[in-house]
Each structure stands twice: as C-alpha cells, then as structure tokens.
C-alpha cells in the first residue's frame, strides 16, 4: 500500500492482472523469519497475502489486514490453495486496531509506504518478546535504486525506523539490496523486539 492510492485504486490494480506481486515471500523476510518459533502474527498491509499465507504454512496463527477487497480475496484464494487458515480483515491499516488486549508475537510490515505513523502504533501491539519486522524501500532507492514509490515522503531512513521502534530492542537495522533484472533495489530492514519483562 502506498499513500495517495485508495482502496479502489488498489482493487483496480489487483484486478487487472494475475498477480501484482510474487506469490513467494520477499527473500529477506523468508531468510529472517524461516527459523523463528511460531505464535500469533499480524501482516499489516498484506496486499495479496503472500506473506500471510507463507507464515501460516510455517505454523503461525496469522491475522492479515488490508483495505483492498480484491487483494484480500486473492490472499484468501492463495491460503485455500495451500490449505492454511488466515484471519483476513478488510480494513485501512491507518485506522485499524486489534481487539482490546490482543497482542502479537510478530508484526510484519512489508513494503507499506505511508506518511501515517503506522509503525509507532504497531509496536504497541507486540506481546512481550514479540518482534516488529519491517522491510520497505529506502530513501536512497529514490536516487540510486530501481522501483518503489517516487515520493521521498513515503520512503524511509534508519533514523525514522529507529524512532518508530523506540522502547524496543533493535536487533537488526540496515539496508538490504535486491538484485533485479533492471538494476538494484535498495531496501531498508528492521527487526526490533519488545523486551520480555515489559508488561
């Protein structure tokens, strides 16, 4: 999801092709989460649900949120194809809130580019020991990489990710380069964990 594009625009985009994104998870997401112990996961801005379905196949209990009805329907079909259960929620991540008292062992935010402070809200939904895992296009990608939003306000810096994870223990923060046929894309990745003793 990108700011400036509403649910109708994303519905049209998803309806216009077989898949907008790959059905496989992002390589960095897969490498980072593949060996983690499973629990409750939230995929915020799930799009067509590729990460939600992949996490569910690993054994996570997943809630996936996106404002695109078409994207959610694609995710639902993908989950059915591989025989996994996901709690699909059609809602705008800028206003969605979990049920009172509901927390997650993992909040995944992949390529969600908004001006709203979604990450700061997402960190409050972590269970003790839970992790906020974020990957998106880095600000440097605008001038030195390929793809992604062409609006600097929607791209991120390490300082912004650090601020968004205030109160969490940052385990990983830095750029990740994806080699694509038309050049390199520069992403920014974060893993930040709520301390176990934080009640």
Residue ranges and their predicted role:
Residues 113-125:
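A short, conserved alpha-helix within the catalytic core of class I
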Residues 81-93:
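Conserved SAM-binding strand-loop segment of SAM-dependent methyltransferases
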Residues 68-70:
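Conserved SAM/SAH-binding beta-strand->alpha-helix loop
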Residues 1-37, 39-47:
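Conserved class I S-adenosyl-L-methionine
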Residues 129-137:
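Conserved beta-strand signature within the Rossmann-like core of class I S-adenosyl-L-methionine
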Residues 153-167, 173:
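Short alpha-helix
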Residues 98-106:
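A short acidic, Gly/Pro-enriched loop at the edge of an enzyme's catalytic core
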């Amino acid at each position: 999801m990108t700011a400036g594009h509403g649910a109708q625009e994303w519905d049209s985009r998803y309806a216009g092709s077989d898949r907008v994104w790959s059905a496989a998870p992002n390589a960095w997401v897969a490498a980072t989460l593949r060996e983690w112990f499973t629990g409750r996961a939230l995929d915020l801005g799930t799009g067509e649900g590729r990460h939600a379905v992949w996490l569910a196949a690993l054994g996570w209990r997943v809630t996936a949120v996106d404002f695109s009805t078409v994207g959610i329907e694609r995710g639902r079909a993908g989950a059915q194809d591989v025989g996994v259960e996901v709690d699909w929620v059609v809602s705008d991540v800028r206003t969605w809130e979990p049920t009172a008292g509901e927390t997650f062992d993992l909040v995944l935010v992949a390529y969600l580019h908004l001006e709203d402070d979604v990450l700061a809200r997402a960190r409050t939904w972590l269970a003790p020991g839970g992790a906020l895992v974020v990957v998106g296009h880095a600000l440097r990608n605008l001038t030195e990489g390929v793809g992604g939003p062409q609006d600097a306000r929607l791209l991120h810096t390490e300082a912004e990710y650090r601020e968004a994870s205030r109160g969490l223990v940052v385990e990983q923060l830095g750029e990740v380069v994806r080699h694509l046929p038309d050049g390199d894309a520069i992403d920014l990745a974060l893993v930040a964990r709520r301390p176990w003793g934080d009640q």
